From Swiss-Prot:
All residue ranges annotated as the ACP-type MB domain in the record: 159-192
Pfam families: CBS
GO MF terms held by the record: metal ion binding
Gene3D superfamilies listed in its UniProt record: CBS-domain
Entry keyword set: CBS domain, Iron, Metal-binding, Repeat, Zinc
Domain CBS: from-to ranges: 13-72, 78-133
InterPro entries in alphabetical order: ACP_MB, CBS_dom, CBS_dom_sf, Diverse_CBS-Domain
Organism: Methanocaldococcus jannaschii (strain ATCC 43067 / DSM 2661 / JAL-1 / JCM 10045 / NBRC 100440)
Protein name as annotated: Uncharacterized protein MJ0653
Residue sites binding Zn(2+) per the record: C164, C167, C182, C185
CDD domains tied to this protein: CBS_pair_bact_arch (cd17775)
Cross-referenced PROSITE patterns: ACP_MB (PS51901), CBS (PS51371)
Length: 194
């Protein structure tokens, strides 16, 4: 019998994943979310995840700027620094990644291709005790633990538990150009610099 924390994400993930292409309008994406009662759509190219559009992305990047959803494409709104998890990783690993990066869902991949999606709710439903572990893990400072490696140097920066000085998000933030910001706000600033 498997201990709940050792369960692979492939056993709790949702599949098939509701996905879209980067050329779809935000209007169509929002309708897909509504029809399927979901909070995010994974954007794929050749079945490989290249981004994710969340409800928060739509509110921050379309609604709050008074843009017309039919005129805005997914590629303009999606979070491009998508964090994925291998299907054989444990739900504990998934929970730690979510806590570290302040995200609620992780696309699950096999050989780089999208095979499912795992959410905080999926994990807590199977292993409620992980909720406490995740909260505790999120509050540990980088000095007290190793920074999680995600097979890329891109995410090796040190995070702290705090408040984003741009949007007010509470969770994992990191120093960026003299301010503590969440990953989504950092991505927005980097896009503006390009």
């Amino acid at each position: 019998m498997k201990i709940a924390c050792d369960i692979p994400v492939s056993e709790v993930m949702s599949f098939p994943v509701i996905k879209a292409t980067k050329n779809m309008s935000i209007y169509d994406i929002a309708n897909i979310m509504t029809e399927n009662n979901i909070g995010a759509v994974v954007i794929v190219e050749n079945n490989k995840p290249i981004g994710i559009v969340t409800e928060r992305d739509i509110v921050k990047r379309v609604v709050s700027k008074n843009l017309k959803p039919k005129d805005v494409l997914a590629e303009e709104v999606m979070s491009k620094k998508i964090i994925t998890i291998p299907q054989n990783a444990s739900i504990t690993e998934a929970a730690k990644i979510m806590a570290t990066h302040g995200i609620k869902r992780l696309p699950v991949v096999k050989d780089g291709e999208l095979v499912g999606i795992v959410t905080q709710s999926d994990i807590v439903r199977v292993s409620p005790e992980l909720l406490e572990i995740v909260i505790e893990y999120a509050s540990i400072t980088p000095e007290e633990k190793e920074v999680i490696s995600l097979d890329t140097d891109e995410f090796s920066e040190e995070y702290i538990n705090g408040i984003c000085e741009n949007c007010g998000y509470q969770g994992r933030v990191r120093l960026y150009q003299g301010r503590y910001l969440c990953d989504e706000c950092i991505e927005e600033f980097e896009e503006k610099e390009e």
